[in-house]
Curated annotation (Swiss-Prot):
Protein name in UniProt: D-erythrose-4-phosphate dehydrogenase
Keywords assigned by UniProt, alphabetized: Cytoplasm, NAD, Oxidoreductase, Pyridoxine biosynthesis
Originating gene: epd
Active site: 154
Lineage: Bacteria, Pseudomonadati, Pseudomonadota, Gammaproteobacteria, Alteromonadales
Catalytic activity entry: D-erythrose 4-phosphate + NAD(+) + H2O = 4-phospho-D-erythronate + NADH + 2 H(+)
Residues reported in the UniProt entry to bind substrate: 153-155, 199, 212-213, 235
């Protein structure tokens, strides 16, 4: 049994906990502790009730600063300094670092000094970590000596498996990406101050361009794609599910049917459970709570002049990513034991 702790219990932290119980991986992973500065009553309430993902079916109780889920007991901590967390006494194998604020190796080492054996960051990190993993593509690079690993981003997890499939079958010369991302909690409900002037504006009233490092994230996973991609991102007034508009120029000449067939076969084969494929007339909310990293919308595939291909990809940017956090942590332990 892998003993884990969650540091930072926001959207991703709570999704990880809920995904653990829904995915069937509870027999492999035990959440021992949650470190979150919010009040315990709010922690319990937001675990039980969620506007996006609905009510959590197991009954959640608060007893003496402990979260009870059935027979499981999870200690709730409120320690702002990771170096002071009781990971050694709790025998923590992996910390899910989900604050969104601790993103480099040096900061994550505080968890290691506190006694955790490994750290998995739920965010793109600095380049000094031991590895950045997109599960399904490069988890085989994990090694026993790796202590600090990044799970990349939700959009990197969405797009990299698709690029990998296209490149292996047709060769990818270059690409351009537009991420159409749901609003996030770094935006404002009504106009208010923010360092990014566009994010001073009400999230529910505008389509808001934001900076993205997605192209650099692709390069980190697929180094041979360096300088081949550029990306932009806009936030839209929905609370969950993201679409990615991917355009790639291929080495080979293709048609729509060939591209869709290759992607559908990959979704049903090597990337089963990671990629999905649909030719139904669906909309974003139909992918809410979908555990896969990416779903290709075959109805929107387009080919121009035989080599320019446009795809539409969907992902639940919370739930799919949370499920990959679980998968990557299991792969980290497997590598450590090999």
């Amino acid at each position: 049994m892998i003993r884990v702790a969650i540091n930072g219990y926001g959207r991703i932290g709570r999704s990880i906990l809920r995904a653990l119980y829904e995915s069937g991986k509870r027999q492999q992973i035990q959440i021992v502790a949650i470190n979150e500065l919010a009040k315990p009553e709010a922690i319990i309430h937001l675990t039980q009730y969620d506007t996006t993902h609905g009510r959590f079916q197991p009954r959640v109780k608060l007893v003496d600063d402990q979260m009870l889920i059935g027979d499981d007991v999870i200690k709730i901590l409120h320690e702002p300094d990771p170096a002071k967390l009781p990971w050694r006494e709790m025998d923590i194998d992996i910390v899910y670092e989900a604050t969104g604020a601790i993103l480099d190796r040096n900061s994550c080492e505080a968890h290691i000094l506190a006694g955790a054996k490994q750290v998995l960051i739920s965010h793109p990190s600095s380049a000094d970590v031991d590895g950045t993993i997109v599960y399904g593509v490069n988890q085989d690079l994990l090694r026993a000596e790796h202590t600090v690993v990044s799970n990349a981003s939700c959009t990197t997890n969405c797009i990299v498996p698709v690029i990998d499939v296209l490149d292996k079958h047709f060769g990818v010369k270059s690409g351009a990406i537009t991420t159409i991302h749901s609003a996030m909690n770094d935006q404002q409900v009504i106009d208010a101050y923010h360092d990014d002037l566009r994010r001073t504006r009400a999230a529910g009233q505008s389509i808001i361009p934001v900076d993205t490092k997605l192209a650099r994230g692709i390069e980190r996973i697929l180094p041979h794609m360096k300088d081949k991609f550029e990306a932009i991102s806009v936030r839209v007034p929905t609370i969950n599910v993201t679409a990615i508009d991917l355009s790639v120029t291929l080495d080979k000449t293709v048609d729509i049917a060939t591209v869709n067939q290759v992607l559908e076969l990959a979704a049903n084969g090597r990337f089963n459970g990671i990629l999905g494929y649909t030719d139904e007339p669906l909309v974003s909310c139909d992918f809410n709570h979908d555990p896969r990293s990416s779903i290709i919308d075959g109805t929107q595939t387009r080919v121009s002049a035989g080599q320019l291909v446009k795809l539409l990809l969907w992902c639940d940017n919370e739930w799919g990513f949370a499920n990959r956090m679980l998968d990557t942590s299991l792969a980290m332990i497997a590598a450590k034991q090999s």
